């Protein structure tokens, strides 16, 4: 995979047909990362405790295997409190989000899947563990992908498998392995979000095809994610110090894309959230203000990533 890079994209040209329903000027995708219970811990036979996106900031990985209860407890806030605070806000405004759900986290708290389905949200997969898959043997990563799909499907009241996929810290094997797992399980190919390189969805060749453009190349739809309009910047430097920083940055990004849509070039925007970060009251205010700003505008389509993928596929099908 990834033998070449595409540095051109649409070369600055808007798509010729508005892909969004009701002639919307922008498609907005909120994404809630549900990772609590899937992070590194000695409890899960890892070498040490989690050091990424914590309230303690970036810390060196411990030289000896220890448990750090303060970090574990901060993650637990996300599943016990933060998730529900965020979910209730979306229910109040009657708009959906897509969840990147870690399979192991879902196994440890399956009730969240039913709650999201009941609220009309989409439960996508974030793989089985919240770890870096670079260097993980392909056979191990394959099993993790399979476990994640099965964990989410088991927790789903409708027995739904995830249709959207985002590993995050992916390996060069991830994309092909995900497609292979879905094929082996008899499931339709998912939509891939392990890219950050466009304001539009776009197609790539099917990783399982004999070769690009061959008869068996059905294409793979990429729905790009974001590390930019993302509350992870509360925990990395340079980043957001308070909820006003988050709100101002996300609002400005929305306003620029919304203006481009009004001028005839409707785009999509993604906003990444984490239960243990934005779920804290002091940061939550920024999300409240952003939600009010976005939902006050005409011609805004707040959608799940599956809905965005379906809309794009209908107007812009794959051309091998």
Swiss-Prot record:
One of its GO terms (molecular function) is identical protein binding. Its EC number is 3.-.-.-. Signal peptide: none annotated. The keyword Magnesium does not apply. Keywords: Cell wall biogenesis/degradation, Chitin-binding, Hydrolase, Metal-binding, Sporulation. It is found in: Prospore. Belongs to the polysaccharide deacetylase family. Homodimer. This is Putative polysaccharide deacetylase. It comes from Schizosaccharomyces pombe (strain 972 / ATCC 24843) (Fission yeast). The gene is cda1.
């Amino acid at each position: 995979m990834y033998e070449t890079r595409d540095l051109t994209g649409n070369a600055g040209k808007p798509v010729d047909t508005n892909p969004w329903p009701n002639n919307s000027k922008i498609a907005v995708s909120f994404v809630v990362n549900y990772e609590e219970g899937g992070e590194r811990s000695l409890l899960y036979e890892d070498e040490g405790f989690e050091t990424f996106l914590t309230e303690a900031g970036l810390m060196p990985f411990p030289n000896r295997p220890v448990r750090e209860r303060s970090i574990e407890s901060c993650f637990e806030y996300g599943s016990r409190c933060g998730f529900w605070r965020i979910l209730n806000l979306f229910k109040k405004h009657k708009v959906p989000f897509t969840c990147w759900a870690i399979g192991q986290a879902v196994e440890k708290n399956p009730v969240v899947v039913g709650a999201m389905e009941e609220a009309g949200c989409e439960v996508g997969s974030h793989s089985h563990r919240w770890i870096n898959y670079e260097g993980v043997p392909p056979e191990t990563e394959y099993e993790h992908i399979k476990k994640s799909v099965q964990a989410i499907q088991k927790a789903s009241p409708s027995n739904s498998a995830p249709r959207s996929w985002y590993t995050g810290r992916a390996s060069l094997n991830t994309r092909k392995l995900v497609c292979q797992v879905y094929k082996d399980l008899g499931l339709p190919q998912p939509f891939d979000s392990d890219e950050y390189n466009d304001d539009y969805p776009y197609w790539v060749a099917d990783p399982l095809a004999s070769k690009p453009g061959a008869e068996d190349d059905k294409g793979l739809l990429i729905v790009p994610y974001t590390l930019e309009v993302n509350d992870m910047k509360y925990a990395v430097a340079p980043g957001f110090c308070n909820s006003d920083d988050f709100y101002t940055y996300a609002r400005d990004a929305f306003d620029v894309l919304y203006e481009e849509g009004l001028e005839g070039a409707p785009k999509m925007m993604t906003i990444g959230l984490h239960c243990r970060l934005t779920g804290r009251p002091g940061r939550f205010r920024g999300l409240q203000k952003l939600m009010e700003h976005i939902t006050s505008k005409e011609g805004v389509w707040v959608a799940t990533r599956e809905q965005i993928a379906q809309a794009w596929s209908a107007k812009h099908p794959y051309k091998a």
